[in-house]
Amino acid sequence: MISVPIEYYLVVAAVLFLIGSIGFLLRRNLLVLLMSIELMLNAVNLTLVAYNRVHPHDHAGQIFTFFVIAIAAAEAAVGLAIVLAFYRIRKTMRSDDADLLRS
């Protein structure tokens, strides 16, 4: 079986994180911002799992990955609830309008 070098995992994780950070910085749609955050968290998960491939007897990478997945699920649930409430009030999904929370 062919083993994939650790550098490939890290390059893919860096590209995912870069795409997520560019999406977070440049886009104004709240749902796209949440998806960009999720993409960055998945890049971190990939890095942690790659760490676990280098150190197979240390399960810290997998344990931290489970914590990050749990935090990402909570962040997605709370974030989507806030976006839905904001959309019901303002009828828009633009993050520029989020500073106008008072009516």
Swiss-Prot record:
Q: What are the entry keywords?
A: Cell inner membrane, Cell membrane, Membrane, NAD, Quinone, Translocase, Transmembrane, Transmembrane helix, Transport, Ubiquinone
What EC number(s) does the entry state? 7.1.1.-
Q: Name one GO molecular function term.
A: quinone binding
Q: Which GO terms describe its cellular component?
A: NADH dehydrogenase complex; plasma membrane
**Localization per record:** Cell inner membrane
**Pfam families assigned:** Oxidored_q2 (PF00420)
Q: Which residues cross the membrane?
A: 6-26, 30-50, 66-86
How does it sit in the bilayer? Multi-pass membrane protein
In the record, biological process GO terms are: ATP synthesis coupled electron transport
Reaction equation(s) it catalyzes: a quinone + NADH + 5 H(+)(in) = a quinol + NAD(+) + 4 H(+)(out)
Q: What NCBIfam families would the database entry show?
A: PRK05715.1-2, PRK05715.1-3, PRK05715.1-5
Similarity remark: Belongs to the complex I subunit 4L family.
Q: How does it assemble?
A: NDH-1 is composed of 14 different subunits. Subunits NuoA, H, J, K, L, M, N constitute the membrane sector of the complex.
Indicate what this protein is called per its UniProt record: NADH-quinone oxidoreductase subunit K
Lineage runs: Bacteria, Pseudomonadati, Myxococcota, Polyangia, Polyangiales
